[in-house]
Regions:
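Extended, non-catalytic subsegments within catalytic or DNA/protein-binding/adaptor domains
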Residues: 1-246
Length: 246
């Protein structure tokens, strides 16, 4: 038997399993991020502002932590537009499922206020958090990378550090936010965000485009989680629907 046939045989005997339930509750995490030490933003530490901003951007965009790591403040890479903010990563970044000939990655995030008349919902707005973070860090940053470590010398944050911040946001919700026997992972934001978006009216094709999957089947087969729908563009559905369950 060739090695390829042996691997295939083992795969068929023990196919990979996929958890249907998310390992943590997005509504509970959002609820935690709406309270001290994360709010009010004006009183929050740089670390807490960073944790909240990174998490909200991850959820609103459905991007991997590697894409967040590639976000840049170089001229033209953060565009504050009327309908939201457009983020363009470092040109050297290529999403996992892109090819070198693919068009440049652009991440567009809408403000939550554009889709909710409830003033209190602003605490979950990724555009608000990102703008506050950008102003708070612009005098500390020596390079062009958006996310920097929260202590001197304020050097560019690594991918691992960004992952740890995402996990810290999840852990801020306490053990009751975790499904039994689960450990929070930064990569889970991708599946949870896109699942909320799908269950709340965003087509698979839109999710495929926003999150840069090779095909919709990748999302359906490996990332779709069994999350409840709450109420009927990507960032709007992922955040506003989850926040609406409180």
């Amino acid at each position: 038997m060739t090695l390829g046939k042996l691997i295939r045989a083992l795969f068929l005997q023990r196919p990979p399993t996929r958890k249907l339930l998310p390992s943590w509750s997005l509504p509970k995490v959002l609820e935690a991020l709406a309270k001290p030490p994360f709010e009010p933003l004006a009183e929050a530490s740089l670390r807490d502002i960073t944790i909240k901003t990174v998490f909200l951007v991850a959820i609103a965009s459905g991007q991997r932590h590697s894409a967040l790591h590639a976000l840049s403040v170089a001229p033209g890479h953060i565009r504050w537009e009327l309908g939201g903010v457009r983020l363009i990563p470092n040109p050297s970044y290529i999403a996992k499922n892109q090819t070198s000939s693919s068009s440049l990655v652009e991440i567009f995030i809408q403000p939550l206020s554009a889709h909710s008349s409830i003033g209190a919902d602003k605490v979950w707005c990724p555009v608000r958090a990102l703008k506050y973070y950008w102003h708070r860090t612009k005098d500390k940053r020596s390079g062009n990378q958006l996310f920097i470590i929260t202590k001197e010398p304020f050097s560019p944050a690594s991918r691992d550090t960004i992952s740890k911040w995402i996990v810290a946001a999840i852990q801020a919700a306490g053990p009751e936010a975790l499904a039994p026997g689960n450990v929070p992972r930064a990569h889970d934001t991708r599946s949870v965000a896109t699942s909320w978006a799908l269950f709340n009216g965003v087509s698979v094709e839109e999710i495929h485009k926003a999150a840069y999957w090779r095909s919709p089947n990748s999302f359906i087969s490996f990332y779709l989680k069994d999350v409840p729908a709450a109420e009927p563009s990507f960032s709007r559905a992922a955040l506003s629907a989850a926040a609406g369950t409180h």
